């Protein structure tokens, strides 16, 4: 499954052929997303990815976002995983990542990397006790730290984040869960302008537009990932095997997370 392309070969060839003869905005979207994701940062940015409910694909989005930022910025990206489950190791194709011995940053970059598990340009780690402290410390060495925060991240982590990405199913229940999660973030003093939503369809052909429009009408920036059989497979996530539209949406999400919100 890890090597299964999201789009069959005949469809990729047909898509390439038809794009020659029609005008689409894929190239311009990729260019804009790439420019946005490459914005320079003065301090390490912390991007929290959380699930509005269980089984929404939070780890998949966190890994996809981290891989996209690492590729576009051409630099290592830190990935902090709060929950102790096997999703991260399978998505990164690495051995289970044990908790760190300390949440404090190392004395230098080499020492920090030796305490982390590498998968391509992603360096993964689990906090010892304090995820917020670890995320702050990693900012000494990494321009971007993505935190796979599960469903119930610490309030300090989300209030200090430069972006909070809520992952939900593209359904009525999903939008309700998003509304509830956003209310909880507001109560925890999370900056509303840092909040982004990613809707993930459970099956091919699921109606997603109506649910996305509902959230956007509420003032919530919302992205919709297409159903992608490579990501849905549950194995190691490789951007090159994802569908073109999946890659574009992840790029646009990456650009949005790097856009500094008004404080």
Residue ranges and their predicted role:
Residues 1-48:
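Extreme N-terminal, non-catalytic leader segments
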Residues 202-247:
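Beta-strand-loop-alpha "switch" segments that mediate conformational coupling across diverse proteins
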Residues 116-159, 175:
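Phosphate-binding/switch loop-helix module in NTP-utilizing enzymes
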Residues 49-50, 80, 124-127, 146-148, ...:
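Conserved beta-strand segments of the P-loop GTPase G domain that flank and frequently precede/overlap
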Residues 96-128:
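Nucleotide-state-sensitive switch-loop elements of NTP-binding domains
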Residues 47-107, 139, 144, 149:
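Walker A/P-loop NTP-binding active-site region of P-loop NTPases
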Residues 177-195, 212:
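Conserved C-terminal guanine-recognition region of P-loop GTPase G domains, centered on the G4
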């Amino acid at each position: 499954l890890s090597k299964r392309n999201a789009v069959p070969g005949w469809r990729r060839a047909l898509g390439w052929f038809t794009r020659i003869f029609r005008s689409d905005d894929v190239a311009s979207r990729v260019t804009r997303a790439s420019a946005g994701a490459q914005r320079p940062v003065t301090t390490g940015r912390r991007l929290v990815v959380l699930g509005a409910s269980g089984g929404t694909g939070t780890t998949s989005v966190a890994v996809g976002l981290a891989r996209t930022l690492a590729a576009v910025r051409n630099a290592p990206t830190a990935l902090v995983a709060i929950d102790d489950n096997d999703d991260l190791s399978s998505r990164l194709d690495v051995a289970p990542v044990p908790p760190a011995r300390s949440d404090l940053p190392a004395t230098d970059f080499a020492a920090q990397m030796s305490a982390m598990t590498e998968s391509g340009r992603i360096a993964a780690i689990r906090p010892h006790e304090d995820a917020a402290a670890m995320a702050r410390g990693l900012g000494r060495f990494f321009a971007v730290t993505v935190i796979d925060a599960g469903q119930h991240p610490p309030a300090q982590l989300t209030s200090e984040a430069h972006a909070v990405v809520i992952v939900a199913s593209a359904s009525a229940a999903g939008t309700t869960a998003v509304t509830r999660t956003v209310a909880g973030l507001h109560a925890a003093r999370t900056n509303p302008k840092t909040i982004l939503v990613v809707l993930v369809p459970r099956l091919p052909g699921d109606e997603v537009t109506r649910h996305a429009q509902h959230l956007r009408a509420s003032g919530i920036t919302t992205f919709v990932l297409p159903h992608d059989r490579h990501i849905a497979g549950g194995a190691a996530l490789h951007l090159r095997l994802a569908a073109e539209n999946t890659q574009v949406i992840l790029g646009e999400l990456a650009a949005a997370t790097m856009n500094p919100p008004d404080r």
